[in-house]
From Swiss-Prot:
Compositional bias segments (type: Low complexity): 109-120
Similarity remark: Belongs to the GYP5 family.
Full protein name: Putative GTPase-activating protein C1620.12c
A GO BP annotation: endoplasmic reticulum to Golgi vesicle-mediated transport
Sequence ranges assigned to domain Rab-GAP TBC in this UniProt record: 215-408
Gene3D superfamilies assigned: Ypt/Rab-GAP domain of gyp1p, domain 3
Region (Disordered), start-end ranges: 96-120
UniProtKB keywords: Coiled coil, Cytoplasm, GTPase activation, Nucleus
A Pfam family that the UniProt record links to this protein: RabGap-TBC_2
Regions annotated as coiled coil: 500-636
């Protein structure tokens, strides 16, 4: 691939050199006039206008954000909703993003905005000035020797060289000539006065990106990004001005997250400016996220993953353009669910696409993932949200962002498939899901890191060979038309697995119920065994008692038989003895009767004697009473 790029580059340089030698004299004579006329013919160039609308939330001091207080007025143009949505499908059928990520309905209402040629902003970048100057010439032959254009190209080369960006493959005039927006297209010959509303084709942009080693030059990113994501809709700028003055309940949490997370880790390079990038301020990040969270309230966004993308756009463009570019980038790229707090659909779709591609390219890897029950790549979401900036340098992460702007979710699929194919042996030998999680949480890009140059690299890791990674990813034979079938198959398998899991849960519940019943029965059996033991002991005791009672009964029966025999043998003797005893008793009774008669006589005599004694007693009592009275009278007489 690099050989073909070098060959095309050398041929382009030779052709440009020949044109320069032929038209040098002619263009030098007209150079000054052309450079003056270029500023007058830039009606439809990318101009910058202020967007504070006297809004306190949009006003910034120059110390805070000197480079970000402008907005591209050329983006304030209406765009038919269906044409820009079908743009990728018409121009690049082989790299078409996934369907189902069309812009939200708020995109549909447009209003035309006319920008007069007198409102030319002096804050244009060198690339925008180069585009304006090139448009004033109209063709390559007349523009190639313009002193103004040459000075701008020289400045662009210097800017790129200061950032260690190779400029040998960059043809600035081709980048300036490529149509990026609808107004860059030539007028229709049949109706010259009609303005073009259809978006320009993407094929020239893609060819230039391929020639530049699949990378957009840093000075061109501002315009090319907006062109790739179709962010030329002026109603988003108006909406941004409205949302910036609207109260947001998430402002406190957004400020807290920005204060805690900004300019740390992958965000640290955005703290400083460069020759092609602006310095990003925390206030500009807050304004963009404030408007973005108000723009889409259908889901709850996670603020931390949005920080890197927001800083990337703010480092190249103003707040309004960064807002609409962020909206279009997330909506059209199909990566919206990377930034949602509770994400499930992308978790399934991303893994479904990766697993489907692995099933076509390396069935052993797909079978291994299925064997260890892998169903999610959510561990990689923070790295995917920042274009692997946590493992790459900022220029390399921005290169990946260029490819994501072109391919969308498909590029993430290609990058992950390339990594998994590179680590095929490691994945095939995995035996548990814990090993897979450990692999994702470790250095996933280890297979693409360059060999060690120093003996010890304790504090830093070796750089990643991004060219090899991107070339391997784009060289994969992936058919994007199979993506819907991958998703449907995965949805079917997930539904089957869900059904099986539900059945398994029901069986587990039934098993638990049966286990509890068995436990209860076992406890009942233990109790019954105890009762059975008690009853068996009682039965044995009863049997012993019964045997003893039977023995006693036999003895009693024998005694009774003996008694009966004895009674049968001695009845007469008993009768005689009874008669004798009766006669004796009769005699004794007669004696008692005689004794009773004598006793009665004695009792009568005693009764008579008792009567006499009682009579004497009464007489004595009377005598005693008389004596007492006499005694009292005598005693009283002696007292007196």
């Amino acid at each position: 691939m690099s050989k073909s790029v070098n060959a095309s580059l050398s041929s382009a340089i030779n052709s440009v050199t020949l044109v320069k030698q032929e038209n040098l004299k002619e263009n030098l004579q007209n150079g000054s006039a052309v450079s003056v006329g270029s500023s007058e013919s830039s009606n439809h160039s990318m101009k910058e206008i202020s967007l504070d609308y006297s809004s306190p939330s949009l006003q910034q001091t120059e110390e805070q954000d000197r480079e970000l207080n402008f907005i591209d007025s050329s983006m304030l143009r209406p765009t038919p909703p269906q044409e820009s949505d079908n743009r990728l499908a018409v121009e690049k059928p082989n790299i078409q993003p996934l369907q189902g990520h069309s812009p939200v309905p708020s995109f549909m209402s447009t209003a035309s905005t006319n920008i007069s040629s007198s409102k030319i902003n002096n804050n244009q970048t060198e690339f925008e000035q180069l585009r304006d100057s090139y448009k004033s010439h109209g063709d390559l032959n007349s523009a190639i020797n313009d002193s103004r254009i040459q000075s701008i190209i020289f400045e662009l080369n210097q800017q790129c060289e200061k950032e260690s960006i190779p400029v040998s493959n960059i043809d600035w005039l081709q980048w300036a000539s490529v149509p990026l927006f609808a107004y860059d297209l030539p007028p229709d010959p049949s109706n010259p006065n009609a303005t073009s509303s259809s978006p320009p084709p993407l094929t020239p942009i893609l060819e230039l990106i391929k020639q530049n080693n699949f990378c957009i030059p840093s000075p061109c990113r501002k315009l090319v990004w907006q062109s790739l994501v179709s962010a030329e809709r002026n109603e988003l700028l108006t909406l941004y001005a409205t949302l910036s003055t609207t109260n947001n309940s998430l402002d406190s949490s957004i400020r807290k997250i920005i204060r805690m997370q900004s300019f740390r880790g992958p965000l640290e390079p955005f703290k400083y400016s460069s020759t092609t990038r602006h310095k990003v301020s925390t206030e500009s990040i807050f304004h963009v996220l404030h408007a973005f969270t108000l723009f889409d309230t259908t889901v709850e966004y996670n603020i931390e993953p949005l920080l890197w993308l927001t800083c990337a756009f703010l480092s190249y463009m103003a707040q309004g353009n960064a807002f609409r570019s962020l909206v279009c980038f997330i909506q059209r790229g199909g990566i919206r669910e990377f930034f949602i707090s509770q994400s499930s659909s992308l978790d399934e779709s991303l893994f479904a696409l990766v697993w489907g591609c692995l099933g076509d390219l390396a069935p052993s890897v797909a079978i291994s993932l299925q064997r260890i029950k892998v169903s999610s790549l959510c561990i990689l979401y923070p790295s995917l949200a920042c274009c692997f900036a946590d493992s790459l340098q900022l220029p390399e992460a921005l290169r990946l962002m260029d490819l994501i702007a072109i391919y969308g979710l498909e590029m993430f699929v290609r990058l992950l498939v390339a990594i998994f194919l590179k680590d095929r042996d490691k994945i095939v030998n995995m035996v548990s899901h814990e090993q897979w999680v450990k692999y994702l949480r470790s250095d996933v890009l280890a297979s693409y890191r360059q060999p060690l140059v120093q003996k010890y690299t304790f504090y830093t890791r070796t750089p990643v060979d991004l060219n090899a990674w991107v070339e391997d990813s784009l060289a994969l034979n992936i058919d994007t038309t199979q993506f819907p079938s991958y998703l449907s198959y995965h949805e079917t398998s997930v539904s089957h697995n869900t059904y099986r899991q539900n059945n398994l849960e029901e069986l587990k519940n039934q098993n638990d119920y049966l286990t509890s019943q068995i436990t209860n029965l076992e406890e009942g059996m233990v109790m019954l065994n105890k009762e059975n033991t008690k009853l068996s002991e009682a039965l044995s005791n009863h049997r012993v008692t019964r045997s003893e009672m039977e023995e006693a009964t036999e003895i009693l029966k024998n005694n009774s038989a003996d008694l009966k025999a004895q009674l049968e043998k001695q009845p007469q003797e008993l009768e005689n003895r009874l008669l004798q005893e009766i006669s004796i008793l009769k005699q004794r009774n007669q004696k008692f009767l005689k004794n009773n008669a004598t006793s009665i006589q004695q009792i009568q005599y005693l009764d008579e004697e008792l009567g006499k004694t009682l009579k004497q007693l009464n007489d004595l009592k009377e005598k005693h009473a008389q004596l007492q009275t006499k005694w009292k009278s005598v005693s009283e007489m002696f007292r007196n």
